[in-house]
């Protein structure tokens, strides 16, 4: 079953393009890009989510990330 998002593909793609442009501008390696993405996720959780919910949300985020990689393999 597909996941339905409250955000449009256009919203997500615009922000992703801007973030990608910043990483390209700074010639960020894949390792640095992933480190930055991880730090952003950590900061969002720590600053915007109750401590009691952080671990559960982080686990769901990790599951979604892994799932998105597995989906790519089948194409």
Curated annotation (Swiss-Prot):
Per the record, a Pfam family?
Answer: DUF1414
Q: Which Gene3D superfamilies match?
A: YejL-like
Organism domain of life: Bacteria
Family annotation (InterPro entries): UPF0352 (IPR009857), YejL_sf (IPR023202)
By sequence similarity, the record places it as follows: Belongs to the UPF0352 family.
Q: Which HAMAP family match?
A: UPF0352
> Can you name this protein?
UPF0352 protein VS_0950
Species, as recorded: Vibrio atlanticus (strain LGP32) (Vibrio splendidus (strain Mel32))
